[in-house]
């Protein structure tokens, strides 16, 4: 066992947590091929990846029932599309919606089939849709007391799977933190972009505002602060050139 001032106690809780994290790192993620360098800043791309997870459920629904998930209440609505909020009511025209219970049961059966074929961490892709489905089932529960047993069973399954996904989510976040530390060793010689005003630095070249006048480096946060305090136009702190609006 290695102990000392530079190496962690291998039986410590942090080491145990690290072992759990390593289990998350060693996987073949189902959507790894959808990676793009702009993923962290491209909302449309992010929505497309999350929608691909719903596509797995929709495809399974078609395989089982020879039809897509057509009920709007159970279609995936992404937060980046501006229509993530669930419908205010089951029907806008007063039509009977009792068949929604059957539709929900079919959706849940499709999810069960997807879950059965999902290896390890891959089940986490269902998390956004499960949160949405949980709200939809609550609406059905409030509307149809006569189907309380059926709807209650669907809610129980969704809640259990949601809890399972959230457990993996915690591990993924821990893995993300570990990877950030590991990347320090891979990119130890990479450039740092430092703001000459606030002295903050980042490895992301987008941290700094493009230079328009002199060689003075300014981050976007400082640029915004200068605009807020300027009477007319913000000016470069070094050469006093007015920035473009």
UniProtKB/Swiss-Prot annotation:
GO terms for molecular function: zinc ion binding. A zinc finger (RING-type) spans 195-240. Keywords: Early protein, Metal-binding, Zinc, Zinc-finger. The keyword Endoplasmic reticulum does not apply. InterPro entries: Baculo_IE-1, Znf_RING. Coiled coil: none annotated. It comes from the Viruses. This is Immediate-early protein IE-0. The gene is IE-0.
